Every structure is written in C-alpha cells, then in structure tokens.
Regions:
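Short, well-structured alpha-helical segments
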Residues: 72-75, 118, 166-167, 181-188
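Central I-helix of cytochrome P450 enzymes
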Residues: 96, 100-105, 146, 173-189
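Active-site substrate-recognition loop segments, prototypically the cytochrome P450 B′-helix/B-C loop
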Residues: 1-91, 100-118, 122-132, 136-141, ...
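Cytochrome P450 catalytic core segment centered on helix I
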Residues: 119-181
Length: 189
C-alpha cells in the first residue's frame, strides 16, 4: 500500500505542501509556512529525486560508518561519565543527548550549539506532548529560530565547507547550476 501511494503522485501528491495547524496566532503559522516554502518533502518525482541526489552522499555507507564511529565514541564517553553514579536523569542525560548528537553530527552543527538544537527541538515537539508546557505559538517560533540557524549554517558552509549535510546543501547543484537561495532555504526546512 505504501509503495502504491508513493508512486501515485496524481492522487497523492506532495506538491500541496504542509497543512500546518494554526491554532492561536495565525501570524506565526503563516511565517512557518513561508519558511517551509518548497522543500524536498513537497516535490514529487522526478524533481524529488534530483534533490535526493544532492543529499545522498551524506547517507552513503562509508559516510554512515564514520558517523556510527563518532556516535559510538560519544555513547562510550557518556556512559563512562555516568559510571559510579547512583542516580541518572535518563531522559535529559542519555535519551535526548544521543539522538541530538547524531543529528548534529550528520548536519554539521558544532558541538557547542547542541544545547540550542535540543531546546528548539523540545519546543517544536512540546506542543504535542501533554507533559510539556509548550503552546503551538512557542513551537512555531522555535521552528523559525531553528530554520534561521540552518540558513546561517548553510551560508557558513558556503565559505567553510566540511563533510556534512549542510555543506552538501550549500554547494548543491541542479542541472549544473548552483541552488538558488530559495531552494537552499527550502532544503533547510
């Protein structure tokens, strides 16, 4: 069923973009929708494949082995830092630290910025969690902040490329031409 839907872009197109719940202040929702613009999630084949090819080097086996080694090292160091402790706040000290590190490694986010990424992430998903006191407006604002950060990081990678996803976006091309600012921005969303 999933394969059939993914191949039937006439009836199940991604081109309509996102239907963002705009409870509360519609201004924030409108800003988020403008920031999302056209991005890899809103393209159908064959355009979707063109964007996917830009990002694929980050997901090749050799690159993923490097990422895996870095994450294993991080987890080993993290567990060593907890050794001998009688109590651990598992969610904040382990369960959230590991995926944020993996995401930041993949994207190329400097380690010193990981706390910001975690805070934005918690605010973005917190509106859906009854245990967190985040409203939809705060979640939308967090999205705009992380989007601005992503645009900043891509711009930085244009002059300081590294072996990361944001550098692939910064230097990506379509049909032999550099990505437009709007396209790069959409890929940050």
């Amino acid at each position: 069923d999933v394969q059939a839907v993914s191949r039937d872009t006439r009836r199940f197109s991604s081109a309509d973009g996102f239907n963002l719940a705009a409870s509360g202040d519609n201004t924030a929702a409108s800003a988020v929708l403008r920031a999302l613009g056209r991005n890899i999630l809103t393209y159908d084949p064959p355009e979707h494949g063109d964007f996917k090819r830009i990002l694929m080097p980050a997901f090749m086996p050799a690159r993923l082995r490097i990422l895996e080694d870095r994450i294993r090292t991080f987890v080993a160091e993290l567990l060593k830092s907890l050794d001998g402790r009688t109590e651990v706040e598992f969610v904040s000290e382990v369960a959230s630290a590991v995926p944020i590190r993996a995401l930041c490694e993949l994207l190329g986010v400097p380690a010193e910025d990981e706390p910001k990424i975690l805070a934005w992430t918690n605010r973005m998903v917190g509106a859906e969690d009854p245990d967190m006191s985040v409203n939809i407006i705060e979640a939308q604002q967090a999205f705009l902040e992380v989007f601005a950060y992503g645009k900043w990081l891509v711009e930085k990678r244009r002059t300081e490329p590294r072996d990361d996803l944001m550098s692939l976006i910064a230097h990506g091309t379509l049909a032999g031409e550099p990505l437009s600012d709007a396209t790069r921005d959409g890929m940050c969303a």
